[in-house]
């Protein structure tokens, strides 16, 4: 017959083609498949060639009444954050259009500063100016904490329901201004669009979660048991002025989460963003002020840590510090707080980690590879939870490395504003130089498995190519490597204890992962490894507020966990009130009980 035909003949190895064949048989054998319907005389040509996307849009949407909508998964406690459906072409086109039209941004402290404006440049292309920022000087830092100290009393006296309602209102404003926040995360912090949307959503979750927790904890004092004729009440109270110091890698979520917890507890806040992401911090504070939080309860203070941080921490009006960043900086803050004769003040510190994932021979390698790509290279590896080490059992190591390096070759490195980008830049030139110096050392001490190529579009940005090295032991890592560099270590069956010891020897305890389908192995690792967040058969990033409270132990932080039910307690102090109720002339409680019995 004069009909053109096409021969469909996949070529490859048995291990690749067999699962492909099975998938095709299942797809083509289904009643709804094109192959099945094309020989059905009852199927019209129009039905066979109809656009599947248009057909899908034409279906009536029916929701199971027992399954809550995503926005309602937390029930009456709080509303879930909303984002952007990045799989919807129309939503993507609208997001891209709005991102392209965002104006330059500018930031200055909430108090007067004599510092001149500084340009803020895009880490993806240092030739592009995003806006400008005025940093605070030492005198401005003193004015900021004085302002917060004056405003703290009035803020504390507001009912907890009112403070919580302002946080809820702020969350709504963050959702309304999601595009502006995402745009700053992309252009100022170098985050991909996917990561930027997640950053904003997490901030919204923090605002609503801490508002809900404040209502639960602070609504009324807790009455404690005791003898008749006596009443004992335990109540929680704010500490005073809190200083919050946030990192640049989560310029919305962590910055907002710290100050939201302090505020809803009744403290006033001096909020210092990371130097590199002051524009994003300014917009966050502007939105919270628009929600109704007073300017003297939340004081925005961008500046260099060595200048303003030193002043804030040493000031006797500072009642506590919430810090997220490097372990070295946390130690410096702790020493500065302890060096005064002021009352002992809490330091809430969430620091870094040398996070490892252990894979045994029973693991599903396809899942291991995908989870490793997410854990090690999302956000260019600039997450405190990111995976730094992959322990893989020797029996499957070659296959795992082959699959991993092949998958790394598919990573798109480039402008984070492009939706196809998987890996964006690191934050600045100093970070880039430090990572490349580490890579040079790893080439000498280990074996380079893969190094991505950077194209010309990356020439003017602070890009570090995703890399993987094989090393003989974890102890070759002397500090946290904060970027897209993965280290692979082989381990032999029967030597799991040595792996556990190697992880423990780092002193860190933030995140840890296990890939195994053997319950005994999972139980051994999860019960013996001391880490704040342990994940089994999934990636080790993306902790969800209220579901996976986040924070480490050892060198990884002080606790309590952010996004957990105990976090607000670190911003509060306890007071016990004991009243002798019999002092009014009789034991009314006892007399009431006797009357009831009669």
Language model: regions and residue ranges:
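Rossmann-like NAD(P) dinucleotide-binding subdomain of oxidoreductase/dehydrogenase enzymes
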Residues: 186, 216-367, 398, 420, ...
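Hydrophobic alpha-helical scaffolding
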Residues: 7-15, 24, 81-88, 134, ...
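Generic, well-ordered alpha-helical scaffold segments in large soluble proteins
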Residues: 24, 28, 147-154, 166-173, ...
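N-terminal Rossmann-like NAD(P)+-binding subdomain of aldehyde/semialdehyde dehydrogenases
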Residues: 30-230, 410, 427
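ALDH superfamily catalytic-core signature
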Residues: 287-293, 314, 320, 327-472, ...
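A glycine-rich phosphate-binding loop feature that marks nucleotide/adenosyl-phosphate handling sites
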Residues: 12-15, 22, 38-53, 170, ...
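Conserved C-terminal structural/oligomerization subdomain of aldehyde/semialdehyde dehydrogenase
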Residues: 4-8, 22-45, 123-133, 140, ...
């Amino acid at each position: 017959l004069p009909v053109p035909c096409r021969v469909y003949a996949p070529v490859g190895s048995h291990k690749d083609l067999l699962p492909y064949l099975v998938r095709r048989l299942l797809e083509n054998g289904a009643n709804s498949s094109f192959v099945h319907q094309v020989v059905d005389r009852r199927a019209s040509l129009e039905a066979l060639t109809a656009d599947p996307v248009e057909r899908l849009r034409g279906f009536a949407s029916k929701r199971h009444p027992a399954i809550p909508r995503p926005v309602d998964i937390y029930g009456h406690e709080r509303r879930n954050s909303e984002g952007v459906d990045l799989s919807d072409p129309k939503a993507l086109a609208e997001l891209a259009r709005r991102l392209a039209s965002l104006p330059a941004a500018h930031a200055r402290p909430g108090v007067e500063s004599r510092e001149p404006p500084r340009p803020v440049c895009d880490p993806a292309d240092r030739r592009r100016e995003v806006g400008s920022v005025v940093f605070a000087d030492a005198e401005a830092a003193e004015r900021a904490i004085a302002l917060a100290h004056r405003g703290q009393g009035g803020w504390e006296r507001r009912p907890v329901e009112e403070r919580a309602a302002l946080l809820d209102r702020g969350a709504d404003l963050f959702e309304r201004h999601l595009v502006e926040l995402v745009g700053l995360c992309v252009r100022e912090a170098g985050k991909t669009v996917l990561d930027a949307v997640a950053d904003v959503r997490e901030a919204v979750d923090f605002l609503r979660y801490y508002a809900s927790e404040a209502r639960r904890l602070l609504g009324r004092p807790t009455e404690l048991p005791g003898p008749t004729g006596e009443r004992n009440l335990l109540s929680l109270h704010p500490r005073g002025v809190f200083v919050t110091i946030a990192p640049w890698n989560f310029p919305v979520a962590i910055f907002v989460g710290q100050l939201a917890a302090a505020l809803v507890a009744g403290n006033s806040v001096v909020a210092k963003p990371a130097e590199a992401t002051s524009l994003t911090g300014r917009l966050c504070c502007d939105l919270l002020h628009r929600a109704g939080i007073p300017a003297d309860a939340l004081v925005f203070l961008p500046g260099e840590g060595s200048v303003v941080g030193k002043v804030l921490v040493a000031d006797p009006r500072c009642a506590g510090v919430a810090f997220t960043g490097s372990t070295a900086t946390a130690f410096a803050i702790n020493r500065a707080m302890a060096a005064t004769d002021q009352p002992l003040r809490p330091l809430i510190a969430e620091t870094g980690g040398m996070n490892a994932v252990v894979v045994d021979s029973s693991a599903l390698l396809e899942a291991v590879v995908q989870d490793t790509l997410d854990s090690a290279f999302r956000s260019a590896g600039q997450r405190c939870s990111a995976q730094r080490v992959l322990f893989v059992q020797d029996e499957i190591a070659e296959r795992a490395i082959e699959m991993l390096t092949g998958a790394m070759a598919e990573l798109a490195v480039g402008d984070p504003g492009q939706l196809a980008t998987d890996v964006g830049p690191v934050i600045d030139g100093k970070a880039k130089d430090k990572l490349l110096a580490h890579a040079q050392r790893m080439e000498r001490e280990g074996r380079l498995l893969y190094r991505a190529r950077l194209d010309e579009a990356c020439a003017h940005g602070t890009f570090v190519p995703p890399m993987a090295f094989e090393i003989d032991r974890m102890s070759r890592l002397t500090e946290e490597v904060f970027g897209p560099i993965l280290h692979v270590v082989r381990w032999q069956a029967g030597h799991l204890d040595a792996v556990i010891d190697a992880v423990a020897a780092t002193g860190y305890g933030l995140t840890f992962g296990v890939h195994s389908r053997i319950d005994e192995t999972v139980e051994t690792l999860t019960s013996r490894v001391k880490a704040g967040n342990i994940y089994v058969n999934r990636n080790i990033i993306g902790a969800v507020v209220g579901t996976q409270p986040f924070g480490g132990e050892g060198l990884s932080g002080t606790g309590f966990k952010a996004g957990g039910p105990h976090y607000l307690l670190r911003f509060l102090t306890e007071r016990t009130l004991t009243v002798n109720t019999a002092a009014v002339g009789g034991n009314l409680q006892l007399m009431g009980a006797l009357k009831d019995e009669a």
